[in-house]
UniProtKB/Swiss-Prot annotation:
Annotated segments matching region Important for homodimerization and interaction with FBXO7: 2-150
Organism: Rattus norvegicus
Biased composition (Pro residues): 255-265
One example GO MF annotation: proteasome binding
Modification sites for N-acetylalanine: A2
Protein name: Proteasome inhibitor PI31 subunit
Purpose of the protein: Plays an important role in control of proteasome function. Inhibits the hydrolysis of protein and peptide substrates by the 20S proteasome. Also inhibits the activation of the proteasome by the proteasome regulatory proteins PA700 and PA28.
Principal location class: cytoplasm
GO annotations of cellular component type: cytosol; endoplasmic reticulum; perinuclear region of cytoplasm; proteasome complex
Gene3D superfamilies for this protein: 3.40.1000.30
Organism domain of life: Eukaryota
Source taxonomy: Eukaryota, Metazoa, Chordata, Craniata, Vertebrata
Length: 271
């Protein structure tokens, strides 16, 4: 029982009753199972310090002992309460994460000799049995329940983020047009609208805020260079310039198609 005698020696000056000696043993058993003592009371305190020793004023209330613990890996926190009842003590332990509760009732006369509480070798009796009961009644149930909860809810795994996250509001870069569209760049400021019309070599974007040629939606295959009566020569319309076709849509070298529904008297020159 390494460490128990050292702990007892540090706490012996404050021991005045068998309950104190039993709580000292309880504290030692909890610490040897991977915990640090934090402090007294139900609620955390700014002055809490992790220690293997009993905290200050740990036995100020002989009727109700309340001690808080934290596991060395920080995963579990315990609240231990020991209530004095006649010639025994009821031990209650709460694990905050799982809300698991374990309790144990001990008879003081079975494990504590109250004749001389200053002598470590005389104070405790049946120490192995006491240690076994604490482990089976408090430590093991708390740890088993915590492991069960941890294994039933494994941590979620997220795939690594891609270089470009999918934005559901982004307009698709796929264009159903047969011709390749120039790269669209937004104006640097609202006052830049139409600025490309002043640049004879500007071929990166149009001058309109809403450009029907770059809207991202399907459009009719209208040739913007069509003129009257024939097509304009190549280069007549600067790339990216605002241009409204001024000739019949769909003209071809063979000439326009005849009207399929001529108006009445269309061939009467005197009409």
């Amino acid at each position: 029982m390494a460490g128990l005698e050292v702990l007892f020696a540090s706490a012996a000056p404050a021991m005045t009753c068998p309950q104190d000696a039993l709580v000292c043993f309880l504290h030692w058993e909890v610490v040897t199972n991977g915990y640090y003592g934090l402090g007294t009371g139900d609620q955390p305190d700014p002055n809490d310090k992790k220690s293997e020793l009993l905290p200050a004023e740990w036995n100020s209330n002989k009727e109700l002992y309340a001690l808080r613990y934290e596991s060395k890996d920080g995963a579990r926190k315990l609240l231990l309460k020991a209530v004095s009842v006649e010639n025994g003590m009821i031990i209650n332990v709460l694990e905050h994460g799982t809300q698991q509760v374990a309790d144990l009732t001990l008879n003081l006369d079975d494990y504590i000799d109250a004749e001389d509480l200053s002598d470590f070798h005389r104070t405790y009796k049946n120490s192995e049995e006491l240690r076994s009961r604490i482990r089976s009644g408090i430590i093991t149930p708390i740890h088993e329940q915590w492991e069960k909860v941890r294994l039933s809810s494994p941590p979620r795994e997220f795939p690594p983020a891609t270089a470009r996250e999918v934005d559901p509001l982004r307009i698709s870069s796929h264009h159903p047009h047969t011709s390749r569209q120039p790269t669209w760049r937004d104006p640097l400021s609202p006052f830049a609208v139409g600025g490309e019309d002043l640049d004879p070599f500007g071929c990166q974007r149009g001058g309109m805020i809403v450009d029907p040629l770059r809207s991202g939606f399907p459009r009719a295959l209208i040739d913007p260079s069509s003129g009257l009566p024939n097509r304009l020569p190549p280069g007549a319309v600067p790339p990216g310039a605002r241009f409204d076709p001024f000739g019949p849509i769909g003209t071809s070298p063979s000439g326009p198609n005849p009207d399929h529904l001529p108006p009445p008297g269309y061939d009467d020159m005197y009409l």
